[in-house]
Amino acid sequence: MSKASLNVLLVSASLFADKGNSRALASSFVSALEASGQPFQLTHHDLVERDLPHLDGAEMQAWMTPADERSAEQRKLAALSDGFLAELRAADLLVVAAPLYNLGLPTQMKAWFDRVLRAGETFRYTEKGPVGLLEGKQALVLAARGGMYAGTEMDSQTPHLKSMLGLMGITDQHFVY
């Protein structure tokens, strides 16, 4: 019996490209997955190389407009987020290669999360609070830091990532520092 193919979505945002520690962690992960014999499909977004723009009001308004009521310009503005959402929904495993810059995420990675954290798409509001819509997925965070921050008050990145992933219903989270 053959193993089912694992659909892996990898997002990375190292300012130092192949010289960055988070990129090295991601490369090691992919190499280990290849060596495991597990069939997989990998979609990788280098958010720095892609030059992902920051979210603006026009783009957010485009998503808030029902798809069948969007103007041509709104459809164009929503296409980037809609594409990221389709990839995330299709993924079995989300791998986040996250360097720590100035106690937080790179702005490019925050811009990606801004586009996938969408009410009605990855979570919904209820009378008891938000409920994630992406249950059953796993997340692996490969966190690179220039110092010892994990488990200290200075680590604002880990709780931020846990909250964003949890908001979407991705509660099976693993962090490697």
Question: Residue spans of the language-model regions?
Answer:
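N-terminal beta1-alpha1-beta2 submodule of the flavodoxin-like/Rossmannoid cofactor-binding fold
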Residues: M1-A98, L103-T107, A111-D114, R118
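Short helix-loop-beta junction
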Residues: S31, A35, G166-T171
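Secondary-structure transition/capping residues
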Residues: F40, F123-R124
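A structural motif corresponding to the C-terminal end of an alpha-helix
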Residues: E87-D92, K137, M168-Q173
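Gly/Ser/Thr-rich active-site loops/lids in small-molecule metabolic enzymes
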Residues: V116-E121, M164
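Short, glycine-/small-residue-rich phosphate/pyrophosphate-handling segment
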Residues: Y125-I170
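Beta-strand-loop-alpha "switch" segments that mediate conformational coupling across diverse proteins
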Residues: F175-Y177
